[in-house]
């Protein structure tokens, strides 16, 4: 099935046109959707329903949510829409498949980076067909991917305090503007640490599976798997030891989710 899903995702990327797309706000100037997001999502839902007829969908755009089936596709048609709208290459299509709430496969395609990440549960992770693994760098050597919870700016102070403490202990930090791109680059050994206050399931489902299959780990504030049906804090690392250190830092500032 992974081959059919990969082909569908690559074909959907043709709808990520560089010119002529329309932009509209979704409640705030920071949260936008483009006509390309909608076109990619419409194409993918049709193709994926044909691959697995008895399946539901949880998608970012237009409130598409049907969790009544054993199989559910979790789709972000363009993760990093703000980047996409500005012509920045850090954006991607993200598709995951869950069965009875357990992630089975993930495909993340970043066409302008020419990076196609794939994973199936228990079968490892690949980028452009080549096996990938997380790095073995220590926390002090680690590069942190993070963000300031752009759509909920009331969390910015707490985020900045956590990021400051992590930054003081690791090598450096980056913000690419796409959780899926960041988690996949971690899977490929390009960074070691990750923290984001609030992600939606479609932001992390596919890339989270890819990271795990590459030897990494991720969790929510409680240390369990991040929810794939509700918003979640997501922490991730290249090793359980580094993940535990991230969680201990977060919990110095945050004992429960503020949403």
Task: Please annotate each region the language model reported.
Residues 96-183, 231-259:
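Acidic beta-strand-loop-alpha-helix segment within the catalytic core
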Residues 1-7, 161-167, 183-259:
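Oxyanion/phosphate-interacting regions
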Residues 54-56, 172, 192, 217:
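Residue-level detector of anion-binding/catalytic polar loops
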Residues 50, 58, 67-133, 209-212, ...:
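Active-site-adjacent structural elements in enzyme catalytic cores
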Residues 37, 60, 76-79, 83, ...:
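Acidic active-site catalytic centers that drive phospho-/nucleotidyl reactions
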Residues 26, 60, 176-178, 221:
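Conserved beta-strand termini and adjacent loop/short-helix elements that scaffold enzyme active sites
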